[in-house]
């Protein structure tokens, strides 16, 4: 095997025009890997620290030169000489070098860039695809996509509190067909919005951000788009998902929809929030709800799980922040039944894989996810297949930063050929159907 001989980081821009890191790792045998780091807009308060410069005269304070310097001057010195295929040793060494619980010293963005680049260099060293290197020859499940075709909340200027309205093509026979279904529904939706005189500009994740009359108007319009594209809503066709991102409009025990929806918005207690979500589930073909309760509302999460946990996938994003400490508590207290996996919430591939493994062992599903600030890096596609996670959330059917992930999955499906599996509805193994 081959040792790491050089590590180099630079500042590049993400899909929102904000700085992020790109890291390159080189080995003595000439292998090479590059990793780029995403960034979130709505972030959980317990996430690992994304190190920013804070210099308002440069990139409005969002520069990442400190993190770049930490890679080039501190991490590189510690990691050069490591065997490139010893991912756990590399990641553990960086965690120890940082020495904080939340990676606040070196920055999770600095550490993650090296973690991804090292894995890619190792795959290059061995001459195998990244998903194969990370998951071995059992990596074969193409994920069911959750496609965010309507953006609300902090991801757009649309007056809707829920951050994402997603379509989930559970009835498609292959990933390739699932992607086609999604694209056709996306374009059907655009025609419907235009016919209503609504805005068809897209938000951060490639979905539309029209001024709907509320949540139900958004869902009804998506259902019309599904039908207009020639598909049907339901378990043998296309289902609906929400990312409520409730922490963005929760304050002092109140779920305050007026923050995004104005005077017409609701103000709900935790129990009323559960009632509202249950009402939506009874009315529409909803299969997944992410962050339906605030990240610190553990009692609310337990009530929600008791009421809906056998019918709907209840995903903890801000709630768990890809951290096994919070996930373990959620499993123990029966709060949610799924975890969203975001590599930059925790900061290394090793810890990411540990969270996925813990979830699966508990019967929780794990959904590999992008961030709203993305790059052309498609590592999450390989992670989804490597872990046989079965689900991915990587945006709408527009914007190259989103399509890069879908296109990589098409390549992987082609490479796997007859071995490839698309689970569709069966990817939601946490539901008692």
UniProtKB/Swiss-Prot annotation:
Enzyme Commission identifier(s): 4.2.1.11
Any one annotated GO CC term: cell surface
Annotated positions binding Mg(2+): 243, 290, 317
A Pfam family that the UniProt record links to this protein: Enolase_C
Domain of life: Bacteria
A GO BP annotation: glycolytic process
Residues at the active site: 205, 342
SMART domains listed in its UniProt record: Enolase_C, Enolase_N
Localization terms from the record: Cytoplasm; Secreted; Cell surface
Binding site for (2R)-2-phosphoglycerate: 163, 342, 371-372, 393
Region (Disordered): 34-56
InterPro entries linked: Enolase, Enolase-like_C_sf, Enolase-like_N, Enolase_C, Enolase_CS, Enolase_N
Main location: cytoplasm
Stated family: Belongs to the enolase family.
Protein name per its UniProtKB record: Enolase 1
Lineage: Bacteria, Bacillati, Bacillota, Bacilli, Lactobacillales
Protein encoded by which gene: eno1
